[in-house]
Amino acid sequence: LKVVDRGNLAGPGNPVQAPANGYRHLDEVVFWNRLVHDAVLAELREERLPVLLGGDHSLGIGSISAVARHCRTSGKRLRVLWLDAHADFNTHELSPSGNLHGMPVACLCGFGPPELLALAGPVPAITPDCLRQVGVRSVDPGERRLVHEQGIDVFDMRHVDEVGMRKTMEEALEGIDSDTHLHVSFDVDFLDPEIAPGVGTTVPGGPTYREAQLCMEMMADTGRLASLDIVELNPAFDVRNRTASLAVDLVESLFGKSTLMRQPDVRGRKQLHAPRAVASA
């Protein structure tokens, strides 16, 4: 496994302004997402596996727009696993804060400012059928209505509680094959704040350490991971680096590090194929 660190992208700072026309800091968010889109697309064109270290989850707009563009060119079917406490399907009409990090899924599905919708050309960048959301437990009423109207597959925490993480991930990963590009968008607030306090928008009742490990291991078992976002980790809110250390452990599992003592049962599963390189955009 060859790792290439592309360093930090450079862009505008946070101007800390009130929303304008329903969006906070739209110009800055557009600027950053264009940078991310171009950086991720460049790595994909070199047949590398891009890893984006954010930053808030609005950066998923640029990252996934680039992945969708690449899939259209390569003929791959896209599957997006969105691991998050929130559905992120707000719009400027629904959001009281105007924060775009609560709107990335809506933007990717065609609901949002034109500057963000068309980053990768066609609008919408993705269709809801390629998206699976896991771990959701905080959704606004209007947002819930939109998610239902779009028919997005949401495996919320009640679903996880009722059937377990193994069954949840089997359902979320169903249909993935050798023609699938698997993109994982991992918002660290997906995790329960008892084990991951270092995020800006904690929501109680998230996956435990072991549930999160199983989630990552099962995605690794597909052998189809092709791009990754890791977002919303905020060291200012962390406790003795607990959240950052946990995120490292989970990403190691996502790349194939196993906690199994027994021989894994891989019947019907594909093994992880090491990518040529990992690039941090």
Question: What are the language-model segments listed below?
Answer:
Residues 128-130, 137-144, 178-182:
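Aromatic-lined glycan-binding groove of carbohydrate-active enzymes
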Residues 81-83, 134, 185:
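Short hydrophobic segments within beta-strands
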Residues 45, 49-119, 222-223:
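Active-site histidine-anchored catalytic micro-motif
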Residues 1-51, 59-63, 70-75, 146-281:
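Catalytic cores of soluble, metal-dependent hydrolases
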Residues 119-120, 137-155:
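Active-site-proximal loop/helix segment associated with metal-binding centers of metalloenzymes
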